[in-house]
Amino acid sequence: MSLPILDQLEEKIKQAVETIQLLQLEVEELKEKNTTVEQEKETLRQEYEQLKSEQQSFQDRLRSLLGQIDNV
């Protein structure tokens, strides 16, 4: 192989390595974002369950009050 061909090959290899490194960084960033989103999802799920429970309590109290009104 001639020297220019080796230089071209070396340059292409360097570019490929740089691209791989950039993609690895991007993958790490996406993993971190995914972790954050999963945590937010879990927080929202817990909040939803709490609100659902509160709603059920309010409905039960309202039914009880309506029942008392009906008895009057």
Curated annotation (Swiss-Prot):
Keyword Coiled coil part of the UniProt annotation: yes
Signal peptide: none
GO biological process, any: FtsZ-dependent cytokinesis
Location in the cell: Cytoplasm
Gene Ontology cellular-component terms listed: cytoplasm
Top-level taxon of origin: Bacteria
Keyword flag Cell cycle: yes
Predominant location category: cytoplasm
Keywords, alphabetical: Cell cycle, Cell division, Coiled coil, Cytoplasm, Septation
Similarity-based family: Belongs to the ZapB family.
HAMAP family the record matches: ZapB
Function of the molecule: Non-essential, abundant cell division factor that is required for proper Z-ring formation. It is recruited early to the divisome by direct interaction with FtsZ, stimulating Z-ring assembly and thereby promoting cell division earlier in the cell cycle. Its recruitment to the Z-ring requires functional FtsA or ZipA.
Protein name: Cell division protein ZapB
Species per Swiss-Prot/TrEMBL record: Actinobacillus pleuropneumoniae serotype 5b (strain L20)
Gene: zapB
